[in-house]
């Protein structure tokens, strides 16, 4: 229950789904009395559920107010909480990803994932190496995201959230700049295969047409491609593990599908201010500093 309470508390927090009025004590009681099994159950709560939860909590704690004993039950707090839960259904992709409580995914990483991939339907099915295509996301964070999304239970929670009315209003096409690293060489480097450096990955990508060809290749073919014997043997041993070979093939397939979804780039010709910071100086005589 403690883990569930923390997950729901994070999910409802101001920078996540922003459910005003859902404090930790309410969450604890909702979990204790079985109203919540996971965060998606928030969107099934009714006014009667909240009132019953509070009544049971007060009886449990021996703290039934005199007004309640007299038959007067306050409901405005519950009305407000139901309204806050309903408002939270409309959210952004970055908030939703942050709210899920994925290990190592704070606000900035959630925003980066949203900005670069743009769509929950895409993100939730990507193999972990492709998350490394986002600037500042390294192997540890990418693996954590992949591990979370590989759990069937987490995917079911996402499904239930969407089924219960959560709407992500800012979906968009993936960033066309992703195309700069959607190739076999980058993928092989991102997979963190022992002894396969970016240089070796580029050699392999030049020698093999695609991931399927590499999976089927014997070690001597990798040596022919330019790899030292120890690197070739390490790669061959890595590929002998079916989980590794499957990850490579799934990642390559997802990479190709992602590349096909990229919009055309509109910034192929960089403008004169591309990548530069501009500072405007001078005065605005008619305005104060705050107005300017």
Residue ranges of predicted features:
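Cys/His-rich short segments
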Residues: 1-19
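Conserved ATP-binding/catalytic motifs of P-loop helicase motor domains
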Residues: 17-25, 32-41
């Amino acid at each position: 229950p403690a883990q569930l309470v923390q997950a729901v508390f994070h999910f409802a927090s101001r920078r996540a789904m922003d459910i005003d009025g859902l404090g930790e004590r309410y969450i604890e009681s909702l979990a204790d009395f079985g109203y919540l099994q996971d965060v998606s159950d928030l969107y099934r709560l009714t006014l009667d559920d909240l009132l019953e939860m509070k009544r049971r909590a007060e009886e449990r704690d021996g703290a039934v107010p005199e007004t309640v004993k007299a038959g007067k039950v306050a409901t405005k707090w519950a009305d407000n909480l139901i309204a806050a839960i309903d408002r939270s259904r409309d959210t952004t992709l970055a908030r939703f990803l942050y709210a899920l409580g994925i290990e190592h995914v704070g606000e900035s990483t959630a925003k980066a994932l949203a900005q670069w991939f743009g769509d929950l339907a895409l993100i939730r099915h990507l193999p972990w190496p492709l998350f490394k295509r986002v600037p500042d996301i390294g192997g540890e964070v990418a693996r954590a995201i992949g591990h979370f999304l590989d759990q069937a239970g987490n995917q079911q929670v996402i499904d239930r959230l969407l089924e219960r009315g959560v709407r992500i209003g800012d979906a968009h096409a993936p960033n066309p700049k992703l195309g700069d690293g959607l190739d076999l060489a980058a993928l092989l480097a991102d997979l963190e295969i022992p002894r396969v450096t970016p240089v070796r990955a580029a050699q392999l990508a030049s020698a093999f047409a695609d991931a399927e060809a590499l999976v089927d290749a014997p070690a001597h073919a990798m040596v022919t491609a330019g790899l030292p014997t120890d690197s070739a043997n390490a790669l061959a041993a890595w590929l002998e593990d079916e989980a590794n070979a499957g990850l490579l093939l799934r990642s390559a397939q997802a990479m190709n599908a992602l590349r096909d979804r990229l919009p055309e780039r509109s910034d192929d010709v960089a403008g004169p201010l591309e990548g530069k910071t501009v500072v405007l100086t001078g005065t605005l005589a008619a305005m104060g500093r705050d107005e300017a």
